[in-house]
Curated annotation (Swiss-Prot):
Positively regulated by the hydroxylated intermediate (heme I) formed at the subsequent step, or by HAS/COX15 itself. It is found in: Mitochondrion; Mitochondrion membrane. PANTHER family: PROTOHEME IX FARNESYLTRANSFERASE, MITOCHONDRIAL. It comes from Saccharomyces cerevisiae (strain ATCC 204508 / S288c). Residues 1-30 form a transit peptide. Belongs to the UbiA prenyltransferase family. The keyword Mitochondrion applies. Its main location: mitochondrion. This is Protoheme IX farnesyltransferase, mitochondrial.
Amino acid sequence: MSYFPRTYAHLMRNVLAHNKGNIYLQIGTQLHDTQIKIRFNGVRYISRNHGGKQQHINTAPIEFTPNFGYGDRTSNCNKKVESTAMKTLRCTDDISTSSGSEATTDASTQLPFNVKLVDPMVRKSKRPSHAISEGLNMKTLKKKVIMPYLQLTKPRLTILVMLSAICSYALSPYPASVNELLCLTVGTTLCSGSANAINMGREPEFDRQMVRTQARPVVRGDVTPTQAFEFAALIGTLGVSILYFGVNPTVAILGASNIALYGWAYTSMKRKHIINTWLGALVGMVPPLMGWAAASPLSHPGSWCLAGLLFAWQFPHFNTLSHNIRNEYKNAGYVMTAWKNPLLNARVSLRYSILMFPLCFGLSYFNITDWYYQIDSGLINAWLTFWAFKFYWQQRINYSAKTLKDNVKFNKGLSVANIYARKTFMASVLHLPAILILAIIHKKGRWDWIYPGEAKRPQERF
């Protein structure tokens, strides 16, 4: 890496913070072989009117590109750039048009990069159309139109939802249909995308306060909340229609119910009560019911064992995820168990990890899988439970009366709990696909040609 990229990386590392007006700038860098670019990815400030709470006021970028030659290398360049930047790139509460233009001109002549100001009051979606239509091609079309709407659906989460429905359909003891499977896949995907788009459209002012969510399209201004709702209505209606006409009315009702449950009930409850986590777990258990109902009646207890697995899995997965970003949830105003009651958060993770054992046993007992499934699923459940127990036990020590009196010991114990939470989260990420894949491998009757004795056992047990 050349000297000048190191200089700008040094500026980024020192955050370029200016205290006047209590405004702080977060800087990110993009380093290329021929061009260096520094961007203000967001502006946060401390508001006295909000009790010192951190607020996020702008996510529109300010770009800096170099106007120097690489031959200009002096020993004092690093200090000169930093001191000049600190003097000229100041943010204050009172900004006038004249002073802003003078500062821009002054910065362009003294700093080794050009400054491109972006009006923070004008979101990208409200800027003149000619500003975005210049040089329009497939690349910009993908970036400006396709990708924002695709991101509204939370693709990775939607894929997981769709796969859970497919796995449940595959485990059904009744015959499968290719057309039915195709309609189930497309309809479930569209319903999940619709629910996620509603969720994003309702929470931009809160999402921009969290690092994990501040790059979402509605927060960036690529899509307005109204556009997000219109998109959600379109794909939601299409998804429910496909499920109704291509599968059956029961699956369509479940799909529509899940859109309402996630997009409205769960999203509304996130800022009111910790019960939102249980509502979110209910959302997770509906897709396996949809997959099962596509081929089999929901009266079969095996369907509820599968749904129970997805319900229970949500807690060790989400509770450990939220533990390590609990302060972000708190600052954004989300009422989560991770910061409201940290010990309960860990205890619930362990409780539902243990619940996986009888649920997997139920799959074999009700003839969905063979009995060999208990061996490998038991090992995977034990792995998840082990880390959930470590996380819970450390939190129990941390929040004991003795530890709470010793800040040094508490902070040290909290660092250990953070590690166990990450371990439990990673175990949960691998746990669910492993459990479902093994269930398909051990589906009842799949290996009867190797173990003919299995075929003679009773096939129905209710």
